[in-house]
From Swiss-Prot:
Localization: Cytoplasm; Cytoplasm, Cytoskeleton; Cell projection, Axon; Cell projection, Dendrite
Function: Filament-forming cytoskeletal GTPase. Involved in the migration of cortical neurons and the formation of neuron leading processes during embryonic development. Plays a role in sperm head formation during spermiogenesis, potentially via facilitating localization of ACTN4 to cell filaments.
UniProt organism field: Mus musculus (Mouse)
Gene that this polypeptide is encoded by: Septin14
Sequence segments annotated as region (G4 motif): 193-196
Subunit structure: Septins polymerize into heterooligomeric protein complexes that form filaments, and can associate with cellular membranes, actin filaments and microtubules. GTPase activity is required for filament formation. Interacts with ACTN4. Interacts with SEPTIN9. Interacts (via C-terminus) with SEPTIN4.
Region ranges (G1 motif): 58-65
Domain Septin-type G: 48-313
Gene Ontology annotations for the cellular component aspect, listed alphabetically: acrosomal vesicle; axon; cytoplasm; cytoskeleton; dendrite; perikaryon; perinuclear region of cytoplasm
Coiled coil regions in record: 329-410
Name of the featured protein: Septin-14
UniProt keyword Transcription present: no
Organismal lineage: Eukaryota, Metazoa, Chordata, Craniata, Vertebrata
Family: Belongs to the TRAFAC class TrmE-Era-EngA-EngB-Septin-like GTPase superfamily. Septin GTPase family.
Length: 430
């Protein structure tokens, strides 16, 4: 059985705070088991699995898919993109990878049609919208009453690999505009794609020009951990941006097979030769050293910035009008009262508007009714006049009919008299 720990107090440096005076640091005299907490955490993490989300931004055909395949040494099947897209789009693919029983869910988001349009003014907007959409989805999950963040598939982008065209001179305006728009939303690692197209002197000059332009435009790129010697060396040795070459083709160099690019005049680039390109440094720093830090930076810096701005737009704040700290309950009650008052005000305004519209409609209906009544009276008078006219015409027609029958009777009588006289004359002649 473990011995009972001593109650000896050990002074804590900088413990002038009165609330910390009663906290004592005790040293145990036996084994209790909580030293296995790191092992428990590792086992739980392995059982749950890891995830990593990469955003690749670059022009069509610059080598985004090839570099991702080279980074993970696998063939992630992708369809080739066309240069004739009318607008910029994004493709999202998720893969399940396994390395020495360590599972990794890899999500690769790539731009499609980026930089192919004549008008490139809004080419960066789909990228910004996608980053904000992932932050918003995570925020909505956080704000749920019954949330399940443990099972939630976090789609927030952890790193943006920005592929720079190897012009050898300077960054394009689109590059500066895009990186300036997303540097507060994602960790940016700039890459010079197809670096084998530049000589060493031109490549170093190009790197210096790129970093100078990034600094002069206030663009923030990812800073590797300073507590790691290799990372600190990258930040200060001028390796950024990384000059990379991707290839899954194995070529023979001497007596060994290496991944490289084979040209008619020979093997110009060995992908994993640090004298040829920075691919190995990029892979080690991205996957072996800083993957977890990239995820932490995404959550603690970029997401928190988005969350803070979003909640402030919704009216939430940590302090009141008098700069006094306000609890969430107080903020909720204040918001509820404000919303209730606003609802009452809007309800009263709606009632007044409704009554005003009712009065206007009533006046409109009265005017329409009066107009219809006048029209009815006018038509009624016209009808009566027409009836009188018809009655007069009928009377005249009846008189004419009577006169006609009288004339007919007189005519028949005269005709009969004539016939009688003619008959008498015939009889006398006989």
């Amino acid at each position: 059985m473990a011995e009972k720990p001593t109650n000896t107090s050990v002074p804590i440096p900088g413990s002038e705070d009165p609330q910390k005076e009663n906290i004592r640091c005790l040293s145990t005299l036996g084994h209790f088991g909580f030293e296995c907490l790191p092992t428990q955490l590792v086992n739980k993490s392995i059982q749950k699995g890891f995830s990593f989300n990469i955003l690749c931004v670059g022009e069509t055909g610059i080598g985004k898919t090839t570099l991702i395949n080279t980074l993970f040494n696998t063939n992630l099947k992708e369809t080739k993109s066309s240069h004739f897209y009318s607008k910029v789009g994004l493709t999202v693919k998720t893969y399940e990878l396994l390395e020495r029983n360590i599972p990794l869910r890899l999500t690769v988001v790539k731009t499609v049609g980026y930089g192919d349009q004549i008008n490139k003014e809004a080419s960066y907007q789909p990228v910004v919208d996608y980053l904000d959409a992932q932050f918003e989805a995570y925020l909505q999950e956080e704000l749920k009453i019954k949330r399940s963040l443990a099972d939630y598939h976090d789609s927030r982008i952890h790193v943006c690999l920005y592929f720079i065209t190897p012009t050898g001179h300077s960054l394009k305006s689109l590059d500066l505009l895009t990186m300036k728009s997303i540097d507060r939303r994602v960790n940016i690692i700039p890459l010079i794609a197809k670096a084998d197209s530049l000589s060493k002197n031109d490549l170093q000059r190009f790197k210096n020009n790129i970093m100078s332009e990034l600094n002069s435009n206030g663009i923030q790129i990812y800073q590797f951990q300073v507590d790691d010697e290799a990372s600190a060396q990258v930040n200060s040795s001028g390796l950024l941006p990384f000059a990379v070459v991707g290839s899954m083709e194995e070529v023979k160099v001497g007596k060994r097979m290496v991944r490289g690019r084979h040209y008619p005049w020979g093997v110009l680039q060995e992908v994993e030769n640090e004298n040829h390109c920075d691919f190995v440094k990029l892979r080690d720093l991205l996957l072996s050293t800083n993957m977890e830090d990239l995820k932490d930076q995404t959550h603690t810096q970029h997401y928190e910035c988005y969350r803070s701005n979003r909640l402030q737009k919704l009216g939430f704040s940590d302090t009141g009008p008098d700069n006094r700290p306000v609890s969430f309950q107080e903020m909720y009650e204040a918001k509820r009262r404000e919303f209730h008052n606003q609802c009452q005000k809007e309800e009263e305004e709606l009632k007044q508007t409704f009554m005003q519209r009712v009065k206007e409609k009533e006046l409109t209906f009265k005017d329409a009714e009066k107009e219809l009544q006048d029209k009815f009276e006018h038509l009624k008078r016209i009808q009566q006049e027409e009836i009188l006219k018809l009655e007069e015409e009928r009377r005249k027609l009846e008189e004419q009919i009577i006169d006609f029958y009288k004339m007919k009777a007189a005519s028949e009588s005269a005709q009969a008299q004539v016939c009688t006289n003619i008959k008498k004359d015939k009889d006398r002649k006989k």
